[in-house]
């Protein structure tokens, strides 16, 4: 649920183990897996043996500085943005990176990660830098503006997202810009 541009309640069903698991959060009340409170704890930088959620085309979209490519970990793209964010909130993935998801793909996951003590960053269009995610719009954002929202999202433990965001280079590729423009025209 998004209220005035801010995710306030989230729940995601993870269809695994015997009967599955529900990861849920409410703003200012933490993230829980069923009844167990989740708390993200990471290191200073990504670890090679841990999972990281990146889009399958990450190598064409992003460059890596200062050895980040060797540190980024075991890369996975599971096909569900909210599922990857839920796994990030529970600590199964150390980071998740998404190029241009829609609000309905990330709203629940953003709250899950933040309420688990994690950090969510969004890449700005003006400076192409990374800023902490605050909301999907202002208090007066219209439904159409929410529908049209798209942003590059990086989520995980605060130390790790800061480390990665300082070493991640966005490659402006004409083909990707053309595809996005065509998608937006549909």
Predicted ranges, named:
Residues 8, 48-49, 149-153:
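Short, surface-exposed beta-edge/turn micro-motifs
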Residues 15-17, 56-58, 156-159:
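Short, flexible beta-strand-to-coil junctions
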Residues 38-114:
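Phosphate/pyrophosphate- and phosphate-bearing ligand-binding catalytic cores of soluble enzymes
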Residues 13, 25-26, 37-44, 165-166:
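Short amphipathic beta-strand/extended segments with alternating polar/hydrophobic composition
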Residues 24, 42-48, 144-147:
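Solvent-exposed alpha-helices and their adjacent loops that cap or buttress functional pockets
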Residues 29-34:
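Short polybasic amphipathic segments
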Residues 1-28:
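DPxDG-like acidic metal-binding loop motif
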Residues 69, 86-186:
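Oxyanion/phosphate-interacting regions
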């Amino acid at each position: 649920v998004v209220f005035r541009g801010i995710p306030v309640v989230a729940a995601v069903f993870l269809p695994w183990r015997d009967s599955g698991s529900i990861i849920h959060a409410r703003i200012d009340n933490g993230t829980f897996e069923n009844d167990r409170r989740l708390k993200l704890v990471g290191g200073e930088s990504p670890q090679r043996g841990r999972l990281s959620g990146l889009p399958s085309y990450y190598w064409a979209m992003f460059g890596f500085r200062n050895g980040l490519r060797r540190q980024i970990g075991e890369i996975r793209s599971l096909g569900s943005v909210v599922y990857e964010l839920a796994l990030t909130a529970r600590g199964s993935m150390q980071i998740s990176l998404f190029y241009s998801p829609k609000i309905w793909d990330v709203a629940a996951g953003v709250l899950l990660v933040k309420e688990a003590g994690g950090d969510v960053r969004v890449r700005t269009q003006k400076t192409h830098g990374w800023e902490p995610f605050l909301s999907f719009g202002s208090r007066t954002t219209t439904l159409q503006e929410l529908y049209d929202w798209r942003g590059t999202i990086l989520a995980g433990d605060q130390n790790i997202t800061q480390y990665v965001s300082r070493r991640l280079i966005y490659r402006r590729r004409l083909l990707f810009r053309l595809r996005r423009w065509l998608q937006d025209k549909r």
